[in-house]
Amino acid sequence: MNRAAIYPGSFDPLTNGHLAIIQRGLNLFDRLVVAVANNPQKSPMFTVDERKALIREAVGNDPRVEVDSFDGLMVDYARTRGIPKVLRGLRAVSDFEYEFQLANMNKKLLPEFESVFVMTGEDYFFVSARLVREVAQFGGNVEGLVPANVLEALQRKLGRPPRS
């Protein structure tokens, strides 16, 4: 049986918390599609193509991981791909409320849709891509919060190395 799930997100940038969820997802599913959301209402630091490349480099050559992107509703993307399962990471109880509402809306739009929630490890429960961006933009050190290739990309994008 080929069990697959979609792990959607903006991944702007990819964090070690995201990587931890990918690893947990691979323990639950045979295949994982990491789907980068293209949201025209946001002003991302990295383009969709840059984010996809950073994710590919960070996950290495694992054949169980596919990196893709989508526009619009994630549930429509899931329907198009024929993968009605989504993997979501939870950092705190506050994440659950939003994710619970989203899961129920997705289920309403696509009845066969299932959401699978996994907790982020204790090392990364406080890490969000938004906080990483803010800290990096102000010259703070985000080493250990993002993969090495993402740290280098942040430094290039911002034109300076982070403070120690």
UniProtKB/Swiss-Prot annotation:
SUPFAM superfamilies assigned: Nucleotidylyl transferase (SSF52374)
UniProt keyword annotations, A-Z: ATP-binding, Coenzyme A biosynthesis, Cytoplasm, Magnesium, Nucleotide-binding, Nucleotidyltransferase, Transferase
Cofactor or coenzyme needed: Mg(2+)
Residues given in the record as substrate binding sites: S10, K42, M74, R88
Entry EC no(s): 2.7.7.3
Binding residues annotated for ATP, in chain numbering: S10, F11, H18, G89, L90, R91, E99, Y124, F125, F126, V127, S128, A129, R130
Residues marked Transition state stabilizer (site): H18
Subcellular location(s) of the protein: Cytoplasm
Molecular functions per Gene Ontology: ATP binding; pantetheine-phosphate adenylyltransferase activity
Pathway(s) served: Cofactor biosynthesis; coenzyme A biosynthesis; CoA from (R)-pantothenate: step 4/5
Entry GO terms, CC: cytoplasm
Gene Ontology biological process terms, A to Z: coenzyme A biosynthetic process
Record's catalysed reaction(s): (R)-4'-phosphopantetheine + ATP + H(+) = 3'-dephospho-CoA + diphosphate
Top-tier EC class: transferase
UniProt-listed InterPro entries: Cyt_trans-like, PPAT, Rossmann-like_a/b/a_fold
Membership in a protein family: Belongs to the bacterial CoaD family.
Purpose of the protein: Reversibly transfers an adenylyl group from ATP to 4'-phosphopantetheine, yielding dephospho-CoA (dPCoA) and pyrophosphate.
NCBIfam families associated with the record: coaD_prev_kdtB, cyt_tran_rel
Subunit and partners: Homohexamer.
Protein's name in the database: Phosphopantetheine adenylyltransferase
Organism: Anaeromyxobacter sp. (strain K)
